[in-house]
A protein has these predicted regions:
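Intrinsically disordered, low-complexity segments enriched in polar/charged small residues
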Residues: 49, 137, 169-172
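Short beta-strand element of the conserved SAM-dependent methyltransferase core
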Residues: 100, 154-156, 171
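Aromatic-enriched hydrophobic runs in primary sequence
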Residues: 84-86, 136, 175
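Short, low-complexity, charge-dense intrinsically disordered segments
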Residues: 161-175
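N-terminal charge/polar-biased segments
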Residues: 1-3, 157-159, 175
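C-terminal binding/interaction regions
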Residues: 7, 95, 106-108, 115-116, ...
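RNase III-family endoribonuclease catalytic core
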Residues: 2-112, 121-122
Length: 175
C-alpha cells in the first residue's frame, strides 16, 4: 500500500460586502474573503494539498481564475471534483491537518463546526481532521486584519482493488 503527503496554502484579502466562508462554513463577520470564487481559503488549501499529493498540479491548473465558469463558484465543488478525480485514480484521503491564520474574527468558537464539515466533505472520520487557528500577532497583512490564510497538509493512501470496488458499489447505492 502506498501513501503520499500533500501540502497546500492559500491566502485571500478581506473586504466588506463579502460572505466569510471557511472550510465550507459560513461565519458571521463584517468582512469576507475576496476572490474569483467564494474564496474559501481552507477548501482551496486542502484542494491544493490533495492535488499535490496525487501529482496533479494545483488548483489554478484545474480551476483558473480566468475561467468565467468559476466566477463566484462554491469551493466545495473544487474539493468534491478533486476527491472524485483522486478516487478514480485509486487514492483516498487518510487525514488532513489545517492551520488557519486570521487576526479576525476569532475562530475558536467555529473550529469544531469547520472540523465536522471538513470530515463530511472529505468522507473521513472527524478524528482524522484537525483544525488549528493562529493570529498574525499584529504582523503583516494577516496580523493587520487585511487577509486570512490557510495551510493544509493531507495524507492519501492508495486503495486496494477490493476497497475501490466497495466505494464504487457504495456510490452506486447512493444514486
Amino acid at each position: 500500500m502506498a501513501f503520499r503527503v500533500g501540502s497546500g496554502h492559500d491566502t485571500h484579502r478581506l473586504a466588506e460586502g463579502r460572505p466569510l466562508i471557511l472550510g465550507g462554513v459560513r461565519i458571521e463577520h463584517a468582512k469576507g474573503l475576496v476572490g474569483h470564487s467564494d474564496a474559501d481559503a481552507v477548501l482551496h488549501a486542502i484542494t491544493d494539498a490533495l492535488l499535490g499529493a496525487a501529482g496533479l498540479g494545483d488548483i489554478g491548473d484545474l480551476y483558473p481564475d480566468t475561467d468565467p465558469r468559476w466566477k463566484d463558484a462554491d469551493s466545495r465543488l473544487f474539493l468534491i471534483e478533486t476527491l472524485e478525480r483522486l478516487n478514480r485514480l485509486g487514492w483516498r484521503t487518510v487525514n488532513v491537518d489545517v492551520t488557519i491564520f486570521a487576526q479576525e474574527p476569532k475562530l475558536g468558537p467555529v473550529k469544531a463546526a469547520i472540523k465536522l464539515k471538513l470530515a463530511e466533505l472529505l468522507g473521513i472520520a472527524a478524528d482524522c481532521v484537525n483544525v488549528k487557528a493562529k493570529t498574525g500577532e499584529g504582523v503583516g497583512h494577516i496580523g493587520r486584519g487585511e487577509a486570512i490564510g490557510c495551510h493544509a497538509i493531507v495524507l492519501i493512501e492508495e486503495l486496494t482493488t477490493e476497497a475501490q470496488r466497495h466505494r464504487e458499489d457504495m456510490r452506486r447505492d447512493l444514486t
